Amino acid sequence: MLVLIQRVSQAAVHVDDEAVGQIGPGLLALVGMEPGDTEAQLRRMAERLLGYRVFADEAGKMNRSLRDTGGGLLLVSQFTLAADTRSGMRPSFTTAAPPEEAERGFNRFVEICRENHAPGVETGRFGAHMVVSLVNDGPVTFLLRP
């Protein structure tokens, strides 16, 4: 499992010209599931995601987390994130979880995040062609692994 997070002023995801998820200030998280991701890894990633300090404190240092700020969280599944890009000129997706396994894992990850982040968690639509828009704040971008 890997999650690419971006600190945003706002973000939204549309499917067929319909907004299916949107947030104000917070984090956009692109989520790539890998074969064999476990419940423990999902829980660890949720803890890291909600506790990762990427927001400024009073002194301007990145010392506050999403949990501290109460910001929004937009989770978007993205199997291409788990691609093997080590060789050649075309990505291989053998390192990404198969669709059914990935959907189960992503949905469980969303549940865990919702249980632990009362201010709200929005999502895209698994497996759909999505148009993601965001206003990057910083930019501040990190790749997290459990």
Curated annotation (Swiss-Prot):
Catalytic activities: glycyl-tRNA(Ala) + H2O = tRNA(Ala) + glycine + H(+); a D-aminoacyl-tRNA + H2O = a tRNA + a D-alpha-amino acid + H(+)
Entry GO terms, CC: cytoplasm
Domain of life of the organism encoding this protein: Bacteria
KW Cytoplasm (keyword) present: yes
GO BP term, example: D-amino acid catabolic process
Primary enzyme class: hydrolase
Record EC number: 3.1.1.96
Motif segment (Gly-cisPro motif, important for rejection of L-amino acids): 138-139
Entry's Gene Ontology molecular function annotations: D-tyrosyl-tRNA(Tyr) deacylase activity; Gly-tRNA(Ala) deacylase activity; Ser(Gly)-tRNA(Ala) hydrolase activity; tRNA binding
UniProtKB keywords: Cytoplasm, Hydrolase, RNA-binding, tRNA-binding
Cited InterPro entries: Daa-tRNA_deacyls_DTD, DTD-like_sf
Subunit: Homodimer.
Annotated function: An aminoacyl-tRNA editing enzyme that deacylates mischarged D-aminoacyl-tRNAs. Also deacylates mischarged glycyl-tRNA(Ala), protecting cells against glycine mischarging by AlaRS. Acts via tRNA-based rather than protein-based catalysis; rejects L-amino acids rather than detecting D-amino acids in the active site. By recycling D-aminoacyl-tRNA to D-amino acids and free tRNA molecules, this enzyme counteracts the toxicity associated with the formation of D-aminoacyl-tRNA entities in vivo and helps enforce protein L-homochirality.
Family assignment from sequence similarity: Belongs to the DTD family.
Name of the protein this chain belongs to: D-aminoacyl-tRNA deacylase
Name of encoding gene: dtd
